[in-house]
Amino acid sequence: MQTTGALLISPALLRSCTRGLIRPVSASFLSRPEIPSEQPPCSSVPLQVARREFQTSVVSRDIDTAAKFIGAGAATVGVAGSGAGIGTVFGSLIIGYARNPSLKQQLFSYAILGFALFEAMGLFCLMVAFLILFAM
């Protein structure tokens, strides 16, 4: 039977070499550099210790940028809906006033309320688009 090199490694050496693998990411980045102890170095062991780093390639950055623009474009569709809603509200105001001029004040107050609701939704959609573009 063949024995592999992994079975011949002492437990202390294995613990010292895999210490970086079991630490949380925040502890790996925020801790101070460790003082070397009297344990044997890991360089003689054929184990490859994985380093936890945030790496972004050009392709992943391009995908993130494209996703930002697609999300912001989808959020601005609501602004067009807001414009259509405001047009509908004031069109209905004109039609209602033409049918019954005595209700001018009540129709106008309802039209202003409808305008405010549609305008708020449009501004909310625009705010979400800007948040997607500049805050993420």
Curated annotation (Swiss-Prot):
Checking InterPro entries in the record gives: ATP_synth_F0_csu, ATP_synth_F0_csu_DDCD_BS, ATP_synth_F0_csu_sf, ATPase_proteolipid_c-like_dom, F/V-ATP_Csub_sf
Q: Where are the transmembrane segments?
A: 77-97, 112-132
Question: One cellular component GO annotation, for this chain's record?
Answer: mitochondrial membrane
**Annotated site, Reversibly protonated during proton transport, chain positions:** 119
Q: Which GO terms describe its molecular function?
A: lipid binding; proton channel activity
Query: Where is the protein localized?
Result: Mitochondrion membrane
Location of the transit peptide in the chain: 1-61
Gene3D superfamilies per record: F1F0 ATP synthase subunit C
| Membrane topology, from the record | Multi-pass membrane protein
**PTMs?**
Trimethylated by ATPSCKMT at Lys-104. Methylation is required for proper incorporation of the C subunit into the ATP synthase complex and mitochondrial respiration.
The Gene Ontology biological process terms listed for this entry are:
proton motive force-driven ATP synthesis; proton transmembrane transport
Catalyzed reactions: H(+)(in) = H(+)(out)
Q: Which residues carry this modification: N6,N6,N6-trimethyllysine?
A: 104
Task: Kindly state which keywords UniProt assigns to this record, in alphabetical order.
Answer: CF(0), Hydrogen ion transport, Ion transport, Lipid-binding, Membrane, Methylation, Mitochondrion, Transit peptide, Transmembrane, Transmembrane helix, Transport
Which disease does the record tie it to? This protein is the major protein stored in the storage bodies of animals or humans affected with ceroid lipofuscinosis (Batten disease).
Binding partners and assembly: Homooctamer; the c-ring consists of eight c subunits forming a circle, and each subunit adopts a hairpin shape. Component of the ATP synthase complex composed at least of ATP5F1A/subunit alpha, ATP5F1B/subunit beta, ATP5MC1/subunit c (homooctomer), MT-ATP6/subunit a, MT-ATP8/subunit 8, ATP5ME/subunit e, ATP5MF/subunit f, ATP5MG/subunit g, ATP5MK/subunit k, ATP5MJ/subunit j, ATP5F1C/subunit gamma, ATP5F1D/subunit delta, ATP5F1E/subunit epsilon, ATP5PF/subunit F6, ATP5PB/subunit b, ATP5PD/subunit d, ATP5PO/subunit OSCP.
Task: Tell me, in a sentence or two, what this protein's role is.
Answer: Subunit c, of the mitochondrial membrane ATP synthase complex (F(1)F(0) ATP synthase or Complex V) that produces ATP from ADP in the presence of a proton gradient across the membrane which is generated by electron transport complexes of the respiratory chain. ATP synthase complex consist of a soluble F(1) head domain - the catalytic core - and a membrane F(1) domain - the membrane proton channel. These two domains are linked by a central stalk rotating inside the F(1) region and a stationary peripheral stalk.
Q: What else is known?
A: There are three genes which encode the ATP synthase proteolipid and they specify precursors with different import sequences but identical mature proteins.
Q: What protein family is recorded? A: Belongs to the ATPase C chain family.
Which protein, by its recorded name, is this? ATP synthase F(0) complex subunit C1, mitochondrial
Q: Which organism is it from?
A: Sus scrofa (Pig)
